[in-house]
UniProtKB/Swiss-Prot annotation:
Chief place where the protein resides: cytoplasm
InterPro entries named in the record: AcCoA_carboxyl_beta, Acetyl_CoA_COase_Trfase_b_su, ClpP/crotonase-like_dom_sf, COA_CT_N, Znf-ACC
Pathway membership, UniProt: Lipid metabolism; malonyl-CoA biosynthesis; malonyl-CoA from acetyl-CoA: step 1/1
Residues reported to bind Zn(2+): C31, C34, C50, C53
SUPFAM superfamilies attached to this UniProt entry: ClpP/crotonase
Name the record gives this protein: Acetyl-coenzyme A carboxylase carboxyl transferase subunit beta
Lineage: Bacteria, Pseudomonadati, Pseudomonadota, Gammaproteobacteria, Pseudomonadales
Entry's Gene Ontology molecular function annotations: acetyl-CoA carboxylase activity; ATP binding; carboxyl- or carbamoyltransferase activity; zinc ion binding
Length: 306
C-alpha cells in the first residue's frame, strides 16, 4: 500500500467519519419556512414554533395534548378501540397493510386521541388529530373516539376542545367514513343544546370531510397562524374555476378576514387564552396562568452541511 494512501487518504476519511458521528441525529432542524437551522432543545422550548419567522411547525397529537393540558389527572378515552378493515378495501395496497404501517410509524392505533384532564385547573376533555397517521383521515374509530369525548363532556358538563389536522374522510372506509361527518355533527348538536362549550382549533392542515363537519362547528373557532383550511386544495379549485386564487387563499389569516373563523392564536398563547375564554363561557373565575420558568440554553454552532 502506498505511503500516500496510508498517510493522507485514510486519516482524512477517519476524521470525516468522526466529524459526522459527533453530531447526533435529530439535534438540528431546518425551518421549512425561513430555512433557519434551529437547535432542537431550543425549538422544544418554543413549542415547535420557529423563533426566527414564527412558522408553526406540525406536531403530533400527543405532543399537542402534552403542551395544552395540565400535567396531572389525565385519562385517555377510547384507547382500546382499533380500526377494522370491514370492506377488505384495496387500492395500490391493502387497507390493513396501510393501517399496520401507520401504526408502526406513529405508535398510535388510529388518527385521533381523546383525553380528559384539566386546563389551568378547570376540567376539560380534549381531542387531537394525528396527521402522521394516514393524513389524519377520519374513519370509524376517529369518529367513535370523538363521540366518546363529547359524551364525556356531556356527562361531566365540562368544555370540549378539538385540535384538527386532517386531510378529510378516509377513502378506504368509503361510506363508513362519510357517516362520521353526520355522527360527529350530531353529538356536537347535543353539546350545543346542553350549553356546553366546544372550541375548535384549526391547525395546519384541515381539509375535506373534517373541515366540512366537526372542525367548523365550534362555538368558537380558533386557528393557528398560517394554517391551511379548506374543503378542496387550492390546485383543485384553480383547475375547476380556471382562475388564479387570491394570495394567501385558505390560510387562517384569509379566513379571519372573511369571517370564517373567530380568532388566530399562536401556539404559546393557547393555554392562557383558551383557559380564560372557557372560564368566561362556563361562568367560572378567571384562572391563574403561571408560565413555566425558561432556563437558558447554550446553543452550539450549527453544522454547515445540514
Amino acid at each position: 500500500m502506498s505511503n500516500w494512501l496510508v498517510d493522507k487518504l485514510i486519516p482524512s476519511i477517519m476524521r470525516s467519519e468522526v466529524k459526522k458521528s459527533s453530531v447526533p441525529e435529530g439535534l438540528w432542524h431546518k425551518c421549512p419556512s425561513c430555512e433557519a437551522v434551529l437547535y432542537r432543545p431550543e425549538l422544544e422550548k418554543t413549542l415547535d414554533v420557529c423563533p426566527k419567522c414564527n412558522h408553526h411547525m406540525r406536531i403530533g397529537a400527543r405532543a399537542r395534548i402534552d403542551i395544552f393540558l395540565d400535567a396531572e389527572g389525565r385519562a385517555e378515552l377510547g384507547a382500546d378501540l382499533e380500526p377494522v378493515d370491514r370492506l377488505k378495501f384495496r387500492d395500490g395496497k391493502k387497507y390493513k397493510d396501510r393501517l399496520t404501517a401507520a401504526q408502526k410509524q406513529t405508535g398510535e392505533k388510529d388518527a385521533l386521541i381523546s383525553m380528559s384532564g384539566t386546563l389551568l385547573g378547570m376540567p376539560v376533555v380534549v381531542s387531537a388529530f394525528e396527521f402522521s397517521f394516514m393524513g389524519g383521515s377520519m374513519g370509524a374509530i376517529v369518529g367513535e373516539r370523538f363521540v366518546r369525548a363529547a359524551n364525556y363532556a356531556l356527562e361531566k358538563r365540562c368544555p370540549m376542545i378539538c385540535f384538527s389536522a386532517s386531510g378529510g374522510a378516509r377513502m378506504q372506509e368509503a361510506l363508513i367514513s362519510l357517516m362520521q361527518m353526520a355522527k360527529t355533527s350530531a353529538v356536537l348538536a347535543r353539546l350545543r343544546e346542553e350549553g356546553i362549550p366546544f372550541i375548535s382549533v384549526l391547525t395546519d392542515p384541515v381539509y375535506g370531510g373534517v373541515s366540512a363537519s366537526l372542525a367548523m362547528l365550534g362555538d368558537v373557532i380558533v386557528a393557528e397562524p398560517k394554517a391551511l383550511v379548506g374543503f378542496a386544495g387550492p390546485r383543485v379549485i384553480e383547475q375547476t374555476v380556471r382562475e388564479k386564487l387570491p394570495e394567501g387563499f385558505q390560510r387562517s389569516e384569509f379566513l379571519l378576514e372573511h369571517g370564517a373563523i373567530d380568532m388566530i392564536i399562536s401556539r404559546q398563547e393557547l393555554r392562557p387564552r383558551l383557559g380564560n375564554l372557557l372560564a368566561q363561557l362556563m361562568g367560572l373565575p378567571t384562572p391563574e396562568f403561571v408560565a413555566a420558568p425558561v432556563e437558558p440554553i447554550v446553543v452550539p454552532p450549527a453544522p454547515a452541511n445540514l
